[in-house]
A protein has these predicted regions:
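Bacterial extracytoplasmic/cell-wall-associated proteins, especially those involved in peptidoglycan
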Residues: 23-149
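Sec-dependent N-terminal signal peptides of Gram-positive bacterial secreted proteins and lipoproteins
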Residues: 1-22
């Protein structure tokens, strides 16, 4: 069922990308990916803002970071609260509302079930000596973003 939804989203994103982002992503077998329409839009907007024009793989990993935080006891348990928590995302709230879901963020949403989740909880631009880089476990780097847990 969920794979059919992903294929449908991919097809619709080519035909009519403007309307696809409002589709809810839900899979009863996988609560990790369940979200409301509002959360889906928020997840895409923050990924577009944080990725600064990077590809869908980078955006999908940013989205996974947010979804992992929602599941973690260290963070709030909703996508909205994770995104709006003070000082967590450099683009929120200042730049967040300047961005909208786009074709790349739609492709990123479609990739979520297929990308290896390394349980990342943090990401940052490649910076040596930052608080995150010295206090958290480095996992991987993609397009100049470092991911940690």
């Amino acid at each position: 069922m969920f794979k059919k939804l992903i294929v449908l989203l991919l097809i619709l994103s080519v035909i009519n990308p403007i309307k696809v982002y409002a589709t809810e992503v839900q899979n009863p077998q996988n609560t990790f990916l369940q979200m409301t329409q509002e959360e889906l839009v928020m997840l895409q907007k923050i990924a577009v803002a944080e990725a600064h024009g990077k590809d869908e793989i980078t955006m999908a990993n940013i989205m996974l970071t947010i979804l992992n935080r929602r599941q973690s006891k260290e963070f709030p348990n909703s996508i909205k609260e994770v995104i709006t928590e003070n000082n967590q995302f450099s683009t929120y709230p200042k730049l967040y509302n300047k961005y909208e879901p786009n074709e790349t963020s739609i492709r990123a949403i479609c990739l979520l079930p297929f990308i290896e989740n390394k349980n990342q909880l943090y990401f940052e631009n490649t910076v040596q000596g930052s608080w995150i880089s010295t206090n958290k476990i480095y996992l991987f780097n993609i397009n100049d973003l470092c991911f940690y847990k």
